[in-house]
Swiss-Prot record:
Keyword hit for ATP-binding: yes
Keyword Transferase assigned: yes
Function: Catalyzes the phosphorylation of D-fructose 6-phosphate to fructose 1,6-bisphosphate by ATP, the first committing step of glycolysis.
Protein name: ATP-dependent 6-phosphofructokinase
Biological processes per GO annotation: canonical glycolysis; fructose 1,6-bisphosphate metabolic process; fructose 6-phosphate metabolic process
EC number, as in UniProt: 2.7.1.11
Residues the entry annotates as binding ATP: 11, 72-73, 102-105
Listed PROSITE patterns: PHOSPHOFRUCTOKINASE (PS00433)
């Protein structure tokens, strides 16, 4: 193993730059050459590859986004796309690859591994929806972004004695909604993994009113329905004329938290070690604060599950 490359793919997540920095500096420390691939798998196929030095990743640790850029390239799922990628890697004499991203990125990494090219996956997505790890890079930062907004919305909800609905990201996973809702004291948390009944939500709000509570916060994951649609349905139950805030892509940006920076650094460094050990086809992660690695194919077969105990706790504490 003399040369390795790194790319970021799919939706950006705070901490991707920190992980890239760790891969580059750990690899150079171990005597390897490192190449950065711009625009994910699209850049790989197009040969948009450049050599990275120690200084290339300076002033990156605290920056959100990804300086390697990202792009969606569904064509990489085809044999033609994968063979073009392998051709470019061989052309640049690259021996191993690190891929930072979510589920789709892992599929690309697995495809390369099956074609005999050593590839390591690093979980980088704000959704926290990757199996084999307690946390993904970017989740903690996104969570704190949502919590900051929730706290501020709580101020105005209290001042005007209103119900506010906050729509957060999470098409298939409700971790952002659950964790931010619990941390922010939301009166109701609506996630894709748990069915909900509007009658139950209204009953919870009414009980709060009976105790003298004059405002409430409801956090809705986008995968369930839009915040506006939820507000429309809620209004059918009486004078719940809720205000809606859609946080959108602000959740993806911002300087990564200390937790995400440290997590990204640990996962990035471990990825290089695995390549040096000629152990491709693995995804790194963190379990109970220990860095672990799992077969990337097995990770893709597993379905991420919501923390049921945490969901139940949020329901109890929001009474």
């Amino acid at each position: 193993m003399k040369r390795i490359a790194i790319l970021t793919s799919g939706g950006d997540a705070p901490g991707m730059n920190a992980a890239t920095r760790a891969v580059v500096r750990k690899a150079i420390y171990e005597g390897l050459e490192v190449y950065g691939i711009n625009y994910g798998f699209l850049g790989l196929v197009n040969g948009d590859i450049r050599k990275l030095e120690l200084g290339s990743v300076g002033d990156l640790l605290h920056r959100g986004g990804t300086f390697l850029y990202s792009a969606r390239y569904p064509e990489f799922a085809t044999e033609e796309g994968q063979l073009k990628g392998i051709e470019q890697l061989k052309k640049h004499q690259i021996d191993g690859l690190v891929v930072i991203g979510g589920d789709g990125s892992y599929h690309g990494a697995e495809a390369l591994t099956k074609r005999g090219f050593p590839t390591i996956g690093i979980p980088g997505t704000i959704d926290n929806d990757i199996s084999g790890t307690d946390f993904t890079i970017g989740f903690d930062t996104a969570l704190n972004t949502v919590l900051d907004a929730l706290d501020k919305i709580r101020d105005t909800a209290t001042s005007h004695e209103r119900t506010f609905i906050i729509e957060v990201m999470g098409r298939d996973a409700g971790d952002i909604a659950l964790w931010s809702g619990l941390a922010g004291g939301a009166e109701a948390i609506i996630v894709p993994e748990e069915s909900f009944n509007m009658d139950d939500v209204v009953d919870r709000l009414n009980k709060g009113r009976e105790r003298g509570k004059k405002h409430s916060i409801i956090v809705v994951a986008e995968g369930v329905m839009s915040g506006n649609e939820f507000a429309k349905q809620l209004a059918e139950y009486g004078d719940y004329h809720a205000r809606v805030t859609v946080l959108g892509h602000v959740q993806r940006g911002g300087s990564p938290t200390a937790f995400d920076r440290v997590l990204a650094s640990r996962l990035g460094a471990r990825s290089v070690e695995l390549l040096l050990e000629n152990r491709g086809g693995l995804a790194v992660g963190i379990r109970e604060n220990r860095i672990v690695e799992n077969n990337i194919g097995e990770i893709l077969k597993e379905k991420h599950t919501l923390d049921q105990k945490l969901f139940d706790l949020a329901s109890i504490l929001s009474i």
